[in-house]
Structures are given as C-alpha cells and as structure tokens.
C-alpha cells in the first residue's frame, strides 16, 4: 500500500497556508511490493539514502488523467528516476552539468525544509520547449519569502535593523536557509492520494511565506516578552575554557537545574534574571566556544569564569594561556575573575589529576580570583559560583560609583590628550585598535561635534577609546548643548560632562559617563535609577565605607537624565527599544509584596528559630568565686523551652555559634535574695482618691509579697516615699515599696557588685536581678535595667516553664498505647497461684514481675529490683499503668505455671523461704532461682531448638516459649530465619499473639529484620489487622512505616484480616484466635525432659519441617 508522509512545518513555523491545496506531501512508493515500505525510504534532512527501487515523482510532470495508467509504466522509469533524484540529492557524487549544479542548491533547501509538494501520479511524457533535457528538473512554485532580514552581528545575537522583501521568482536565494531536524510524520492510507491530488492547484501557485529558523530563534531571544524593565541592570558574565572543561554542563545546570554530559563546542548565549538582596538584575551569560578570545568578547564582559576539568591536564594548562591572551585586550587586574574546577568526569576509570591545592595556587597567581570546585552532576557549588560572580560585579560598580563621585567633587579641568604615550600602551589601551570596520578614527581637527546616527549605530565602542577618543566626539559648543547634557555636566562638575573619572576601571568605561555617575548600569540607555531606588546593596556600601572610600553627597544624589543619544554596544534589543512597550511578564501585580516578603525572610534568617523574647541583660560571671563581674550578654528565650545567651549580638547573628543553653523543663526562676520562687508579679500601688495623692495620704496596698529582708520596721509612718511627688518624679513610676527593713548580707553584696553603666539612682528595694536554676544546680543570675523589664523576663520565662511541663503531662495523657483498666488488673489475682507471693508465699502481694509473669510481695519486689531490669521488671499493681501487652503476659503465665518452670528441679533438701524468713535467706533463694537458674526446667532433646521455638510460636504455647527463652537461647537462634527470610517475630505478628511478641522483644529479638520481600513484622501485624501488636512494635522503637509497602498508608484503611505475599504459600492460615493447617499440631502432653539441658548445634531452619 503506498504511504504518504505529511511533513507539516506550518505548525513549527507558525505560518498558515493560504489554501489547503498547498499542504506539502511526499509520497514514497516501492515498485516491488506495497507491503515493504520500510525498505525504500528517503530520510530528508539527514543526507541519507536508503532503499532500492524507489521513485519520487515531481508534481510538475504529472497530470490528473495519468492516475489510471498501469503501474508497470511507472516501474519502467524507476532506474532513470532514481538516478536523477540521487544526482539531485547528492550533487557531489558525480560531475554535474552547470544547470544541475544550479538546481542542486534549490533541491537541498527544498529537501531540508519540506516545502516541495509531491503526489503519487504517473509521469507525463511531455516535453517543454527550451528545456535542456527531457528530464530536466522543474522546481515547484516556491513559497513566498518574508521580508528578509539583514543580520547585523551584535554581542548577544542578531538584530533586525533592516527588512527586505524577497522576489517571488523561482530563483529565490536560499543561501541563508539553515536545515532543521526532520519532524515526526503522519502516515495516511493510499485512498487519500486522489483527494490530495485534486486539491493541488494546476495553475501558477501563489507565493507562500517562508521564514528561516534563525528568524524564529532571534524572535524568541529578542522578544518583548523576554525583556525586563529598563531599570533592571545588566551583568555580563563570560565563561571560558576548553571543550573538555565541563563549562557547558556548568551553565546548563545553573539555568535548568539538570545535568547534561554533552559539550557544546560552539558555546552559547543565555539570559537569566537574578535577585540579589531583593534587587533584580539581568545576568547575560556568554559561553565562549572559541579557543582564542577575540577583542569584542574581552571588552564585553564584566566578569570572567575560567573553567577547567580536574581530570584533564590540558584544560588546566589552557587557563594560563587564556588569561594571558585576554590580558592583551583588557586589563584583567581590575576584572573580577573566578576559577572553577569541575569534578563531573571523576570515576573509577578516570581519576583526578589536578588537586585542590594546585587549583588554589593557580587562582592566587591570577589577581582578584576566587576558586571553587563544582559538580554539575549533583549541583555542588554551582549556584555559589554565579552568585559570587554577580556580587563581584556589583562591588566593582560600587567602586566605579565612588570614583565618579570623587572625581565630580574635585575641581574640574580641561583634559589634555597626550598622544606620545601610545607607544608604551598595551593593546587594550590603544583606542585606534578597536574601531569597527564601518567607521574610522578621524583627526581631532576634522571630527564633527556630534556623531551622526549611522556612526553611533555602526561603531563598536570599546572601553579603551573613552579616555582620548570619546571626549572629542562628545564636545559640543556650549550654545548647542541640550538641557540633559547641561544637567549631566553640572552633576559631574565638568564643563562639558565628558571627562571620564580617574577612578573608573576599564571594565566600567564601556558605559557612558552618565551611567557611571549615576551608579547604575541600566539595560536601557534612556533609563536611570532615581534616588529612591536602592541600586547598591547595603552591605557593599558598608564594605566600601570601611575600606576608606568616601561617599560624597554628589554621588549619593542620583540625577535622572536622558541618554538616548548615546550608543548601546551590546544591549538586546537595539537602541530603538525605548519606544517599545515594556512587558509585565516578570513584573506581576504582587511583585512588590513578594519582594518585601523576600526581604523579611532574608532578614529573619534561614533555619533559625525565632525567639519569643530577646534583649541585652547583665549576667554575673560564675567562673571564679573571687572575681565575679557583671557582663553584658544577649539573652534569647525560645518557644521550645530553651534559654540561651551569647556574648553579643554579633555572635548571635553568626549561625555557627549556638551560645550557652539551658532547658527550662528542668529549671525554675526566682528573684535574687528570696528563698522561694516568685509566683506573682509586683503590682503598682494606687493612691486613695480621697487623699488626692498628697504626701500625707496613705496608699492602699493591692498585693504584697513578704521578703526575707522585710523583718523590722522603719521609723516614721512606716512607708518609704509612699506618696511623695518627688519620689514619683525621680523613679518615673508610681510604685509602692514595703516598709524598709535592716539590710541583709544579700543586699550588701548587691550594692557592692552594682553593675556598671547605669546612671539612675538605685535604692536597696529596687532589685532588678533574678536567677534561673536547673536540676544540676547551675545558676544563671541576670540583671535587667528596670523592674518592669525584670518582671517581663520573669513572666516570659515562667510561662515557658509552665508550658514545657504541660507538654510533658499532655504527652503522657495522649499516649496511643492501650492501657488496661483497673478491673482487668484486679482479675490477675484470680489466676491460679497469684493469691500469694511466688517466692515466699506472702498473701499480701501488691507487686508484679511482668517479664517473669509472677506476683510478689513488697519485700521480694525490692530484691527483684536489685537483680536488674534485664532479669526482672517490677511494676506495682496499683501504682503503675499497665499496657495491654504487659497484662497479656501476666494472664498467660501466672505464679503456678512460672514456679513449675523455675522450680522444676527443686531438690527435697532445698527449703523454700517463708514470709517469716529473713531477707538474707530470701535474697539467696531468689538469686539461685532466677540468676543462677539452679532449678530451671531444661529444654527437650531430640528436636532442634529453633524448630521447637517456631513450633511454640505457631501453637501459641507461651510456657514452651518461656522455657526456651529462659534457658538462654542465643540471639542468632532467636533471630533464625526461614527460607523466605521470616523470623519467629514475623510469625508472632502474623498470628496476632501480643504476649509472644512481647516475650521475644524482651529477649533481644530483632524487630528490624526484613524478609525476602522487604517486609517487616509491622507489615504482618498491620495486614492482618492486629492493632495491639502493631502498637507494641512501634513502642519498641520501629517507625510506623518501616518495612511497609507504599500503598499502605493508614492502619484504618486495612481490612480486619488480609493475608499478603508468601502467606498464601504456607500450610497454615489464621482466623481470629483459631489455628488451622493441613496437618494439625499435636497438643498432647509434653515430651519427657532429660535431667540436663541438651543444645546441639542446629542448622538453618526449614519451615516445612516444623508443621
């Protein structure tokens, strides 16, 4: 079946055809078989010929009436057609005629862009007059060309300064056409051939619009939607290095956040908006793909990043050559430089050959150069490199601004050029070296006062030409100077405003003097930042001020002036952009709000907890008892119950310093000199309104708190300045002081060690100090500036102490573990043997050993505690809380069953202690019983221990399991796994036996072991719906999602019983508390137990041998 490939480029080029008949189609047919189209295909745009007997027919040689001819006639011309098309597609493969060579360019362009329409019709035997050959290729009607652009090379791409229209003749120039990759095609059935051919116009085709791919690329780069506001400054960064240096991956990682191993030998030019300290900047990145740096690149950059590969000595050695070559065209001593070593290619097969010390040594040889090592694969230090480059560019501009301000404040003088110094200049200092070919340097007496528009547009201005050339080009007569120029002259302090400041570096001299004086390098020469815009970062201004650079008032007052007449060497788009609209794609309505929030977040810090109260307090030194001084500290109180202090605010701002810290959960606060902590705050006194607040009036005391020093009474009316207006004026507050008492030792010490730096008068009652004491008796004694400040700190710290203690109580109350109620605990006494002590038989038993499963008296409980919790875990029946797993163990064992196991070998001559026995006798018996295990029941012989262990778990036989565990099974035996990797703890969790799982956990069963499917015991407890087992395992230290599949995210979503994985392959299943299997487990009497324990060496357990 013939296939038609529709190469639709209209969607790609965004060009709509005039009619549907012009849609380009290509037909590929095979003369051998319609079922083998894959053997005869032509791949356009790839210069590749595949297939054997393939014919591609020219639509100009076909007619509608030839559709009915026999297909054999078409096959007869295959050989000739194939040869002719091969010659057209590959003109260099043979000696072609002149006419064929002329047509070859058209055919290649047509082939690469799929602008030729082909249809499946039979060839016509017509002959045209004047044709050179019967089979001469007649090109199809070409697509009408759009107005062709004259590409003028700039530093950042192309600019369409002039537009021309192409002719509609068939000999349209396609020299500027760049082949594009072949897009995806659509396969249509052969039935659509006739319909497509009827839509094809037989007359003269109308001209179609054709646009070169470079047009769309430039339109994307220079689009208004991708331009920022005119007030956004540009920062031009150059990236240089060899093709093996990894610079392409570095730039790609910074722009896209992804890694690409492919290197781009031709380089690239990119834009990105960066925000530094809340200010937006447009970063222009130029990846220089050439091995040799040219003049234009060296004069364009504001900073350079030299990139080398730490695995390549060649790329490392090329850095010095590149720096030396750049020094010919640019003074790099004042140019920000960054040396980057990429570690992307380090692997086992390719080791590192350039050490970090060698890289830093090379950076030290290059002045003003920082060194970084990056990894584009993981993104290490990539953002830091470009941020450092941006900061260095801004610092350089600050220095240029300071130099301009200093030059403007100095006395103006007319510059006198000195041409005799040109012999000693370097290349970058020669102004006549970097003039474009479109202009020439005129003698000083022949230069016009104002450069023409064409001169300004076509001249490439470089940094080296300003000191001597630009001053002549910008010296107009005073009568013809514009208002903007006069204002700029007044700002700069020069008669014509054209003398360059002495402090301007060559990297800044490319900009106009107006931009330098203003301190902002704007993307638009007609826009300058006003005085309200923070063009310079605050930290940079501080650094410049500290370095000794004066910031004059003239430099601070920025003047807005129009500089549209000045040339723009490298901005994008061209200089006519001042009349274009400004896109708001980067400036939304809430941009200012987002910027303010960003600044606030930066000021707050990243990753730092915000204190609820902070400030300066005096702290008494506690290092030496002889020399205790008051030192000023910066104290912070946090909401998580922490109190910290730092030496000063600077240390607090440093994120690496944590200061001294105290946990308030274990602390209390009190006022210095008082026995008890302060629970109520001092309340200001109120004066009786009947007395009018006079000196004879007696104030009413609302709240009074006795002090240790308040022992005696003072002479007079018993008050200390109670209603005196002078006292109120002195203290600036109404405050009632209790009756003054004789001074104590604490008051005397306080007066002797009064802090330095306060000018207010203090009496003995105004005690602004307080203490914070923790459980380790560590004292922090602070002193505030006033009583009000002291009370605020006491209230805040006391509130945090209360809150911390409340959280602990709430955590204990909101524990998710199920706790047994009192009736269930009381029911433990009804278990056989629990009515008396398991060791001495005392009927008054209020304590229990939960891991042994016995109830004991209070005296025996003390002895059990001395044994250690690894042997006996003692709990009170009435005092402690009982989780359900502890209660389940107690219900499963009991005193009688436990004594049958622990006193199994008790000899007739051994006497068990009674309640009246001495403590020493009880201690000796309990030690032999539980520590030495002298009477313990041994393990049954004849069967592997691990097999008995799994049999006991599957049978829910707690006592058999207890015997095995008490006889001292090793950790390896307890954690023995089956063929699918499950342990006995997995089995206990799958059957929902919380008592068995708890006993295994107490005997060092590893709950973190996963089976062969990566599932933990939590998975089996959750999948079978055993919530108690799940909570017990989480309490044992497992994470709630440990060893669980991702689709299981909530316990409440799981069914009550759901067996997954290898559970279906077992020969048993569970349903509630029942156990069913293919072979029932023998529940008969226990086997005969030998006199001694038998523990043979056991191999790994096979689960099938247990059941």
From Swiss-Prot:
PROSITE patterns: ANK_REP_REGION, ANK_REPEAT, ARFGAP, GLD, PH_DOMAIN. It comes from the Eukaryota. Residues 138-147 have a biased composition (Pro residues). Residues 104-118, 434-457, 1062-1072 have a biased composition (Polar residues). Residues 610-802 form the PH domain. SUPFAM superfamilies: Ankyrin repeat, ArfGap/RecO-like zinc finger, P-loop containing nucleoside triphosphate hydrolases, PH domain-like. Residues 88-176, 405-509, 551-581, 681-764, 1062-1107 are annotated as: Disordered. Keywords: ANK repeat, Endocytosis, GTP-binding, GTPase activation, Metal-binding, Nucleotide-binding, Protein transport, Repeat, Transport, Zinc, Zinc-finger. Disruption phenotype: RNAi-mediated knockdown in a ced-3 n2436 mutant background results in the production of extra A/PVM neurons; the precursor Q.pp, which is normally fated to die, acquires the fate of its sister Q.pa. Gene3D superfamilies: Ankyrin repeat-containing domain, Arf GTPase activating protein, P-loop containing nucleotide triphosphate hydrolases, Pleckstrin-homology domain (PH domain)/Phosphotyrosine-binding domain (PTB). Residues 822-943 form the Arf-GAP domain. InterPro entries: Ankyrin_rpt (IPR002110), Ankyrin_rpt-contain_sf (IPR036770), Arf-GAP_GTPase_ANK_PH (IPR051282), ARFGAP/RecO (IPR037278), ArfGAP_dom (IPR001164), ArfGAP_dom_sf (IPR038508), P-loop_NTPase (IPR027417), PH-like_dom_sf (IPR011993). Residues 119-129 have a biased composition (Basic and acidic residues). GO terms for molecular function: GTP binding; GTPase activator activity; GTPase activity; zinc ion binding. ANK repeats lie at residues 980-1009, 1013-1042. Residues 159-171, 467-491, 560-573 have a biased composition (Low complexity). Residues 230-406 form the GLD domain. GO terms for biological process: asymmetric neuroblast division; cell fate determination involved in pattern specification; endocytosis; protein transport; regulation of receptor-mediated endocytosis. GTPase-activating protein for the ADP ribosylation factor family. During neurogenesis, involved in cell autonomous neuroblast asymmetric divisions that generate one precursor cell and one apoptotic cell probably by controlling endocytosis. In oocytes, involved in vitellogenin vit-2 uptake by regulating receptor rme-2 endocytosis. Belongs to the centaurin gamma-like family. The N-terminal domain is required for the positive control of neuroblast asymmetric divisions. This is Arf-GAP with ANK repeat and PH domain-containing protein cnt-2.
């Amino acid at each position: 079946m013939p296939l038609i490939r529709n190469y639709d480029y209209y969607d790609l080029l965004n060009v709509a055809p005039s009619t549907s008949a012009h849609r380009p189609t290509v037909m590929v047919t095979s003369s051998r078989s319609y079922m083998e189209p894959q053997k005869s295909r032509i791949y356009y745009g790839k210069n590749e010929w595949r297939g054997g007997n393939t014919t591609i027919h020219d639509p100009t040689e076909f007619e509608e009436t030839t559709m009915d001819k026999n297909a054999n006639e078409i096959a007869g011309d295959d050989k000739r057609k194939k040869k002719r098309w091969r010659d057209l597609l590959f003109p260099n493969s043979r000696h072609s005629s002149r006419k064929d060579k002329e047509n070859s360019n058209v055919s290649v362009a047509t082939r690469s862009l799929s602008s030729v329409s082909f249809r499946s019709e039979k060839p016509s035997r017509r002959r045209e007059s004047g044709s050179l050959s019967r089979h001469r290729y007649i090109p199809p009607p070409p697509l009408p060309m759009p107005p062709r652009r004259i590409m003028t090379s700039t530093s950042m791409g192309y600019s369409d300064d002039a537009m021309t229209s192409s002719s509609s003749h068939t000999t349209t120039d396609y020299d500027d056409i760049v082949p594009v990759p072949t897009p995806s095609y659509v396969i249509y059935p052969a039935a659509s051939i006739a319909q497509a051919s009827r839509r094809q116009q037989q007359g003269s085709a109308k001209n179609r619009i054709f646009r070169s791919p470079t047009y769309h690329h430039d339109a994307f780069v220079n689009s208004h939607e991708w331009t920022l506001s005119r007030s956004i400054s540009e920062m031009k960064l150059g990236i240089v290095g060899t093709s093996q240096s990894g610079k392409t991956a570095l730039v790609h990682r910074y722009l896209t956040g992804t890694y690409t191993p492919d290197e781009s030998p031709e380089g690239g030019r990119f834009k990105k908006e960066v925000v530094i300290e809340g200010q937006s900047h447009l970063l222009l990145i130029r990846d220089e793909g050439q091995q040799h740096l040219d003049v234009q690149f060296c004069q364009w950059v504001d900073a350079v990043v030299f990139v080398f590969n730490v695995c390549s000595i060649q790329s490392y050695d090329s850095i010095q050559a590149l720096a030396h070559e750049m020094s010919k065209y640019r003074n790099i001593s004042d140019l920000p430089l960054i040396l980057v070593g990429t570690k992307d290619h380090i692997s086992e097969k390719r080791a590192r050959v350039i050490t970090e010390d060698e890289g830093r040594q090379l950076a030290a040889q290059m002045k003003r150069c920082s060194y970084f090592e990056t990894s584009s694969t993981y993104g290490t230090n990539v953002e830091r490199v470009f941020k450092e480059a941006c900061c260095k560019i801004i610092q350089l501009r600050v220095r240029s601004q300071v130099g301009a301000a200093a030059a403007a404040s100095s006395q103006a003088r007319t510059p006198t050029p000195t041409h005799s110094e040109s012999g000693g200049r370097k290349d970058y200092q020669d102004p006549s070296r970097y003039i474009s070919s479109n202009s020439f340097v005129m003698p000083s007496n022949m230069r016009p006062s104002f450069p023409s528009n064409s001169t300004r547009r076509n001249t490439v201005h470089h940094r080296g030409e300003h000191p001597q050339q630009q001053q002549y080009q910008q010296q107009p007569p005073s009568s013809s100077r514009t208002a903007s120029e006069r204002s700029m002259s007044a700002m700069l302090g020069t008669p014509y405003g054209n003398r360059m400041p002495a402090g301007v570096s060559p990297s800044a001299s490319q900009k106009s003097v107006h931009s330098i004086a203003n301190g902002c390098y704007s993307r638009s020469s007609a826009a300058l930042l006003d005085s309200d815009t923070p063009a310079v970062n605050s930290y940079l201004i501080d650094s410049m001020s500290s370095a000794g650079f004066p910031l004059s008032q003239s430099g601070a007052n920025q003047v807005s002036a129009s500089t549209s007449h000045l040339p723009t060497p490298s901005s994008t788009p061209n200089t006519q952009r001042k009349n274009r609209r400004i896109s708001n794609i980067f400036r939304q309505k809430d941009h200012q709000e987002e910027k303010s929030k960003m600044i606030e977040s930066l000021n707050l810090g990243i990753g730092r907890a915000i204190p609820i109260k902070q400030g300066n307090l005096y702290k008494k030194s506690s290092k030496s008892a002889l020399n205790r001084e008051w030192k000023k500290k910066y104290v912070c109180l946090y909401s998580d119950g922490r109190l910290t202090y730092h030496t000063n605010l600077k240390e607090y701002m440093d994120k690496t310093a944590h200061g001294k810290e105290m946990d308030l959960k274990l602390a209390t606060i009190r006022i210095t000199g008082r026995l008890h902590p302060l629970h109520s705050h001092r309340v200001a006194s109120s004066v009786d309104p009947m007395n009018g607040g006079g000196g004879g009036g007696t104030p009413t005391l609302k709240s009074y708190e006795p002090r240790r020093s308040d022992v005696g009474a003072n002479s007079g009316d018993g008050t200390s300045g109670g209603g005196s207006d002078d006292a109120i004026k002195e203290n600036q507050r109404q405050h009632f002081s209790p009756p003054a008492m004789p001074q104590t030792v604490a008051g005397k010490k306080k007066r002797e060690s009064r802090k330095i730096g306060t000018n207010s008068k203090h009496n003995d009652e105004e005690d602004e100090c307080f203490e914070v004491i923790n459980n380790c008796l560590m004292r922090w004694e602070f002193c505030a500036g006033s009583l009000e400040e002291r009370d605020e700190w006491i209230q805040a710290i006391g509130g945090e102490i209360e809150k911390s203690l409340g959280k602990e109580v709430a955590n204990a109350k909101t524990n998710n573990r199920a706790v047994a109620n009192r009736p269930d605990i009381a029911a433990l006494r009804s278990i056989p043997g629990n009515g008396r002590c398991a060791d001495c038989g005392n009927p008054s038993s209020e304590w229990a050993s939960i891991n042994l499963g016995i109830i004991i008296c209070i005296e025996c409980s003390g002895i059990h505690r001395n044994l250690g919790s690894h042997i006996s875990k003692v709990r009170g029946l009435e005092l402690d809380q009982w989780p359900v797993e502890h209660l389940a163990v107690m219900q499963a064992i009991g005193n009688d069953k436990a004594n049958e196991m622990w006193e199994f070998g008790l000899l007739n001559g051994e006497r068990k202690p009674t309640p009246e026995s001495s403590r020493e006798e009880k201690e000796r018996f309990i030690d032999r019983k539980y520590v030495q295990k002298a009477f313990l029941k041994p393990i049954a012989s004849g069967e592997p221990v691990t097999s008995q262990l799994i049999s006991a778990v599957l049978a829910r036989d707690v006592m058999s399991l207890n015997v095995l565990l008490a006889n001292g099974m090793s950790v390896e035996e307890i954690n023995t796994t089956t063929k699918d990797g499950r342990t006995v703890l997995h089995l206990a969790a799958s059957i929902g036996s919380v008592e068995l799982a708890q006993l295994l956990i107490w005997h060092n069963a590893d709950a973190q072991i996963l089976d062969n499917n990566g599932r933990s015991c939590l998975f089996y407890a959750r999948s079978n719906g055993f919530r108690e087992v799940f909570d017990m395992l989480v309490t044992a230290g497992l994470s709630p999602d440990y060893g669980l599949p991702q689709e299981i995210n909530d316990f409440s979503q799981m069914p009550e019983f759901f067996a997954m994985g290898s559970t279906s392959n077992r020969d048993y299943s569970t349903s509630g508390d029942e156990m069913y299997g293919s072979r029932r487990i023998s529940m008969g009497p226990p086997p005969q137990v030998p006199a001694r324990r038998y523990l043979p060496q056991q191999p790994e357990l096979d689960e099938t041998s247990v059941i």
